[in-house]
């Protein structure tokens, strides 16, 4: 069962103001407190595809009259609500509107909210890293950070060498970013062996296919060789760019001297 909000109809809002002035004949013999609270509460219930509308009137935290679409009329909950129920039920046109509220209010607003939520979709961004320097044969924590996604329902799984991991996994609940998007952290306790490939597998309604991000276990020496190779490549590209710039300037200088 889910409960859906329903906007207050104009006539109900006007009636709310009217009800705040309590009928003296109803509360005769009682002293109206200096400060009191009146509340009109509207609910939509959806159960197995069927909508039900409930409207409650509450005075100082005590419900005194109620409309339930399953009943079709207002019913007093306390003695205070008897005259209000009689008055509400005498308003035939307004009563018919209440009886139709499961379709005209609940169903309409639910379908509208669903369309709006489906139009707000953001694909997740996924980043995988160890909590500390990845050393082979040492216990570590692998972190899969999934950010900037909407809606908030998401599935994140861990795989090691194409086999799903089911133990040593911890996850946060989806965390609101302050706008309308979410983020989540899912960690995996592991002791990496040479050649191990860990994969963070993310499924989300915004994606046509899952996002998979890999992290490969490697020794410090292999990592250093990789970094050295990358550094050498970057340095070579820098020298190449400088050489090209000097060559172009030299050509321009030769043309200018002619």
UniProtKB/Swiss-Prot annotation:
Q: Which InterPro entries match?
A: Ig-like_dom, Ig-like_dom_sf, Ig-like_fold, Ig/MHC_CS, Ig_C1-set, MHC/Immunoglobulin, MHC_I/II-like_Ag-recog, MHC_II_a/b_N
Q: Ranges in the Extracellular compartment? A: 30-225
Query: What residue spans carry the region label Connecting peptide?
Result: 216-225
The keyword Membrane is annotated on this UniProt entry: yes
Q: Where in the cell is it found?
A: Membrane
Residues of the Ig-like C1-type domain: 124-212
Q: List the disulfide bonds.
A: 44-106, 144-200
Q: Which residues cross the membrane?
A: 226-246
GO cellular component annotations, sorted alphabetically?
MHC class II protein complex
- Region: Beta-1, residue numbers: 30-121
Its signal peptide is 1-29
GO biological process terms, alphabetically, are: adaptive immune response; antigen processing and presentation of peptide or polysaccharide antigen via MHC class II
Which residues are glycosylated according to the annotation? 224
What Gene3D superfamilies does the record point to?
Answer: Class II Histocompatibility Antigen, M Beta Chain, Chain B, domain 1, Immunoglobulins
Q: What is its main location?
A: membrane
Q: Which family does it belong to?
A: Belongs to the MHC class II family.
Q: What is this protein called?
A: SMH class II histocompatibility antigen, beta-1 chain
Source species of the chain: Spalax ehrenbergi
